[in-house]
Amino acid sequence: MRVARSAAGTDTGRKRRRNEDSFICEPPLFAVADGMGGAQAGEVASSLAAAALREGEATASSGEEGVVEMIRGANRRVHHRAQTDASASGMGTTMTVAIVSSADTVTIGHVGDSRAYRLRNGELEQLTDDHSLVAELVRRGELSPAEAEVHPQRSVITRALGTDADVDVDAFSVEAVAGDVFLLCSDGLTTMLDAETIARVLGRNLGDLDAAARALIAAANERGGEDNITTVLFDVADVDDIEQTLEIPALAVAGFDEEDTLHPEDGVRLPPELLAAFVAPGSETAVLSPRPMARMALSALLIALLAGLIVVLVARGLAR
């Protein structure tokens, strides 16, 4: 299993003066962090946590243990800054992380009330449990979900990065099947939109995840936009569905002889200087794969390949 598409968006909202959210959308690593603290401390906390997470990915173990290790490393980074910088005293951040493995699973790590969801066959499932006061009261049966949504302390969280030297991290793995769409988001989205609305907006925009991210943010702002809003989206597909051989129909170019015609069944036969840029040694068929192309979109590769091919063919035709 591999990430097929990904997109992200963030917005200050309609009530806040600055955006204290940070996010990572760098397959196979995805994350959302919602900072808190006076002045610019919240923004600093979330950005520090995101930076530490990126650094920790390179050396962390695999699976749930690795995700916990990464998040605890981010916690230490934020806590150290809060203890040594008077202007950052009391700062903290939520953190929700998703890492896509090749074993048909997505590993989630979670601290705070930023959430992870999975959309499968039109059904939206909340994967994480909020670490918040009202969520705890709901779990104890002291509040109903409806009461929690309007409770005056609904934004009070019970866990965060940076507030203590260590932190409890919830980590687990979920199954991923082709077509699943995963959403990570800050509470600026979920306090404005219920699960039914989120599922409906996603369902209308599944063909374009960039549009889906923008649509979710716009919907939250339409409902009031009381907080910063961040969305990170990705979907997964089987590796065989992503890696594919690129076949280009024969092209007619001025000055090109019949014997030079490109035959689709043979793949694309390119001049050596162009071939080397797109295919593995020993192959004459261009195979596009997200891994060697450093996550470049397949559509952009196709355009670049066609443009380069046409230039070479025209140049050869004019030279005759």
Regions found by a protein language model. Give the residues of each.
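PP2C/PPM-type serine/threonine phosphatase catalytic domain
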Residues: M1-R320
